[in-house]
Amino acid sequence: MRKSIVLAADNAYLIPLETTIKSVLYHNRDVDFYILNSDIAPEWFKLLGRKMEVVNSTIRSVHIDKELFESYKTGPHINYASYFRFFATEVVESDRVLYLDSDIIVTGELATLFEIDLKGYSIGAVDDVYAYEGRKSGFNTGMLLMDVAKWKEHSIVNSLLELAAEQNQVVHLGDQSILNIYFEDNWLALDKTYNYMVGIDIYHLAQECERLDDNPPTIVHYASHDKPWNTYSISRLRELWWVYRDLDWSEIAFQRSDLNYFERSNQSKKQVMLVTWSADIKHLEYLVQRLPDWHFHLAAPCDCSEELTSLSQYTNVTVYQNVLHSRIDWLLDDSIVYLDINTGGEVFNVVTRAQESGKKIFAFDITRKSMDDGLYDGIFSVERPDDLVDRMKNIEIE
């Protein structure tokens, strides 16, 4: 079965757009892509189309006049091209079409989604508590499964265009508001795996959230301004977006790639972490330089100073600013050592949590957060950082 997928983007969004396409084609074949756009160069389509032939897929540019929507109000971090999705059912030759935003990755097969019974509805989507105008129910428009015949039968595109012309300046979330106002309760709710919105993690830093690394949702949506290509985005599965971004077309053709970011980037299994409120972390850069076989995870529940973020230049360092509180637990699970070497207060009782997790805990004499010597596997003079280096070099892992 061939699958029709529509995306909308502008020239500035080419890299995210191509990443979405790569992710789809790594897991699916026989796909016809339709890209609604006003300014993407034809050369891009011609070259990409040649690459897609090996997976029996096609891509087509569908030009939309941006003047139709350029003056329309949109939601935050969204531009006029978001309104292009209204035309999705007009450009395909199939009975069913899937619309996807370009801040999405697909991690599995889509045949099951395409075969869902829409139960007489014109559209299937995933619930979104932020859907529109402060309503507590509605759907997110980043993924829309549409019955083409019903859209044409009811002239839905014309109705949406008329509604948008009337209300685009008063709605809060642009095209998403318009679609929700039009369909109201007349849509089929689909399982959240088909539009799992990790992008909203940024609004729920302290809320417990599910770890998704080993079993990612079928469609991952980096909704919100916190995109994975931002330098320090906090969303879950940020690294997975970069894996799909990194895929070359031979890997897509043969489906033989390692999609584990940490294996792909050759990250050491020797992992050490610390959580801090302060940029004053004793001998941190020295330790990073002297221990290249260790990967340092530096987390902070706040914005990080340049002093800390600059350490990202080292391949054995990852910085997490405004860290998800749940990620602290995940980092503890994966780490061997916790370093209590930052000045200032302890963050979220993390030293005790590290002990309860069975981690080795090392500290300098002037940075230790507890006077209980039994909490630590080593307390070192801040004047002798090489003693800590030597201790860590002697740690073996299975």
From Swiss-Prot:
Provide the function of this protein: May be involved in the polymorphic O-glycosylation of the serine-rich repeat protein PsrP. Has hydrolytic activity against UDP-galactose and to a lesser extent against UDP-glucose; no glycosyltransferase activity has been seen with tested substrates.
Keyword Transport in record: no
The residues that the entry says bind Mn(2+) are D101, D103, H221
Q: Which GO terms describe its molecular function?
A: glycosyltransferase activity; metal ion binding; nucleotide binding
User: What domain of life?
Assistant: Bacteria
Question: Which SUPFAM superfamilies does this entry report, sorted A to Z?
Answer: Nucleotide-diphospho-sugar transferases
Keywords associated with the record: Glycosyltransferase, Manganese, Metal-binding, Nucleotide-binding, Transferase
Protein name (record): Glycosyltransferase GlyF
The misc remark on file is: Encoded in RD10, a pathogenicity island with an atypical GC content that is associated with invasive pneumococcal disease. Pathogenicity islands account for greater than half the genomic diversity observed between isolates. The main function of this island seems to be correct synthesis and export of pneumococcal serine-rich repeat protein PsrP.
Is Nucleotide-binding tagged as a keyword? yes
Q: Where is this region: GT8 domain?
A: 1-259
